[in-house]
Curated annotation (Swiss-Prot):
Recorded GO MF terms: lysozyme activity
Name of this chain's protein: Lysozyme X
Organism of derivation: Drosophila melanogaster
Outcome when changing G6T: In strain: G140
GO biological process, one term: defense response to Gram-negative bacterium
Catalysed reaction equations from the record: Hydrolysis of (1->4)-beta-linkages between N-acetylmuramic acid and N-acetyl-D-glucosamine residues in a peptidoglycan and between N-acetyl-D-glucosamine residues in chitodextrins
S-S pairs: C25-C140, C46-C130, C81-C97, C93-C111
Amino acid sequence: MRALLGICVLALVTPAVLGRTMDRCSLAREMANMGVSRDQLSKWACIAEHESSYRTGVVGPPNTDGSNDYGIFQINDMYWCQPSSGKFSHNGCDVSCNALLTDDIKSSVRCALKVLGQQGWSAWSTWHYCSGYLPPIDDCFV
C-alpha cells in the first residue's frame, strides 16, 4: 500500500518536474524565434504570467465542467488537447495534453495560436488582466 501511495505521489508531481519556469523575456525570444508576430509578444507574456506564472508543467485544477487546463498557456483539454486519461476531447490542436507540459513550448505555442485564431484573446479567462497594462518586451531584444 505504501508503494502504491509513493507511485501516486510521484505521478502527481511528475509534470512539474518535467516543466520549466520561463520569464517574460525567455518566452518572448522563443516565440519570436518561432515566427510569432512581435506585436503579440507582450500579450502572450501577460497571458503566460497570469495563467501559469510562466511555468510549462502546470496542470490547472478541474474546471466546473470537469475539464483541465495544461501548460504555460493553460490550454483546455475538452476542446484543444487529448488528455492521457482517454476522456473525450474535441482535440482541436491534434496534440496530447502531455505535450503541452514539456520544456519545449512549440506545441503549446502552435495550439495557443490556433485558439487565438478561433476564439480571440478572450479565450483566456485572465485576458481582462492584460487588456490594459502589458508587460514590456522591447528590453528582451537589446
